[in-house]
Each structure stands twice: as structure tokens, then as C-alpha cells.
Amino acid sequence: MCRVLGSLYYRQPQDPLLVPLFTLIREGKLAANWPLEQDDMLARLQKSCDITQISTDYNALFVGEECAVPPYRSAWVDGANESDVRAFLSSRGMPLADTPADHIGTLLLAASWLEDQSAEDESEALETLFADYLLPWCNTFLGKVEAHAVTPFWRTLAPLTRDAIGAMWDELQEEEE
């Protein structure tokens, strides 16, 4: 789930690496492997899978100095900086690109990566990632995405992402008990 969502936020929609994912969405096949009951939202994504429109909206929302909704934690959390996130992820052994580590897409991909490592201490790392680096700002960020998006795709992906992050956090809390 995090890998899918992280990829959609991290990569430009026209990126060739996303073609298989957008094909799954367009053909309505993502729902078959989606662990949450979000069929209505997934159906809305399927109906609004126009790459040109999605790309235009992506650029207006997330790209450049004048973007409507900066996709970086440091833009939403007072005193936050990208280097803290980079240091945390590096300490867990995650390979990082030269792109900002506090990008929403990077953080969701990091959650997937940490989950894939599945060592005992990685669930603690996953909790730290959510508690310190995702949850303090993602609801505000996703609310702004929903408010500023002009396409049904991004207006739907924002609450779908919010619900998914909430469900993953709940699952982490249950594992801790």
C-alpha cells in the first residue's frame, strides 16, 4: 500500500515506471490487491485516470516554488528540516537519492521499505517514521491536496491516502499492545 501511494506522490505521473501502476488503476485491478475497504475511492480513481490531466494537476500541486501544496515535511512542521529525516532513514540503512528525504512520497516509500526489512526492531523504526515524520503533518497536507486539486484523481487520492495512513498507524499500535 505504501509503495503504491509513495510512488504516486514521488514520481511525475508521466514517468514510465508508473505505466504499470496506472494501467492497474485504469483497468480497475488495483482493488483486487488493496487491503482496505476503499472500493468507492478506487473506482473514482479508475474513472479519473487521464494522465495528461493528472500530470497538469500534479505539477500545479507539488512542483516548483509556486506549487499550491509543498510535498515536504519541512514546509508544514515548524522547526523541521530535511536533514533530520535523511539521518533517520540513513541510520536504518535505507538507500536515499539526492532528492529531499522529507517528501511525502519518499516517506511513504520509506514505510514500505522498513516494512519489507521486517526485522524485529524495524517495527519500532516504522512507528518512529509515522509518529515523528508522517503523522504530525500529513492530515494538513492531504487536506490541502484535496482542497487545491482540480482533478478527481488527486481529490480522491488525498482521502484514500489519509485513510491508508490511519489504518497503518492503527495496525502498528495494535502490534505494540
Which role does the model predict for each range below?
Residues 1-177:
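Surface/interface-facing alpha-helical segments and adjacent flexible terminal/loop regions used
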